Amino acid sequence: MKVAVLGAAGGIGQALALLLKTQLPSGSELSLYDIAPVTPGVAVDLSHIPTAVKIKGYSGEDAKPALAGADIVLISAGVARKPGMDRSDLFNVNAGIVRNLVEQIAVTCPKACIGIITNPVNTTVAIAAEVLKKAGVYDKNKLFGVTTLDIIRSNTFVAELKGKQPQDINVPVIGGHSGVTILPLLSQVPGISFSEQEVADLTKRIQNAGTEVVEAKAGGGSATLSMGQAAARFGLSLVRALQGESGVVECAYVESDGKHARFFAQPVLLGKDGVVERKDIGTLSAFEQNALSSMLDTLKQDIELGETFIKN
């Protein structure tokens, strides 16, 4: 099993690479790529960790050597948020980066599962899909927007509020991966009930958690370590599913049946070929139904922005 991390010299990429080096199954290969010249050194640094995971780093304009033979590609390359920016401010820079990298994936490892971490995810996933489609290699079951950070934040915040163990909580989060498009389904957390005020406050905190980190870092970065952990969790779930483990379910932003929007975050069952089943989002509370209806225009605009970027 070969996993490639693109953007491996950045804050998310280094955290992700560290977690994969320590947690990938024995015999796996880990390939690190970044435009920054430090990348081969990041790989050498990680190579000293005593796990049976082969690691190599590549830098420069050409990502193809890093991508050769990859089963999974995780893309975290791009610029990070600064205070006062929202995820859409990142679009102008990150759209071109994602397009360029996905074009190289399309020719080098077109059958790989691709996890997009680079924000704005609502838009960058649509960009990736259009690039792959143009190249004639698009498989909607193998392209994912990694929204796992929304899930781990939800689990953490609910556990804090209710005095529970975070690993025992599983909050499904649907919609998209920015602002109002992030919708935690708190009504579906088994064995825990919330007041209306708690639901409103938690939902808002989960939606604004990225900004909470950006402001707390006072201009020194965005959520890199928690995002690295979230991306590693998603990547390792994909590895397990590709290797034949059954019953692996994660929430992810995928091309859906189009009922809500072309791309939609929802629980998906993973298997040997990527998504095996897009699971039903279940019955929503009145609060959730209202939040879903009012976010769809924003989500659709985000998606259209990505589609148009490639088509024009």
From Swiss-Prot:
Its EC number is 1.1.1.37. It catalyses: (S)-malate + NAD(+) = oxaloacetate + NADH + H(+). The keyword NAD applies. Transmembrane segments: none annotated. SUPFAM superfamilies: LDH C-terminal domain-like (SSF56327), NAD(P)-binding Rossmann-fold domains (SSF51735). One of its GO terms (molecular function) is L-malate dehydrogenase (NAD+) activity. NAD(+) binds at G7, A8, A9, G10, G11, I12, G13, D34, N94, I117, T118, N119, M227. It comes from the Bacteria. The active site is at H177 (proton acceptor). It holds the Pfam family Ldh_1_N. GO terms for cellular component: cytoplasm. Belongs to the LDH/MDH superfamily. MDH type 1 family. Catalyzes the reversible oxidation of malate to oxaloacetate. PANTHER family: MALATE AND LACTATE DEHYDROGENASE, MALATE DEHYDROGENASE, MITOCHONDRIAL. This is Malate dehydrogenase. It comes from Pectobacterium carotovorum subsp. carotovorum (strain PC1).
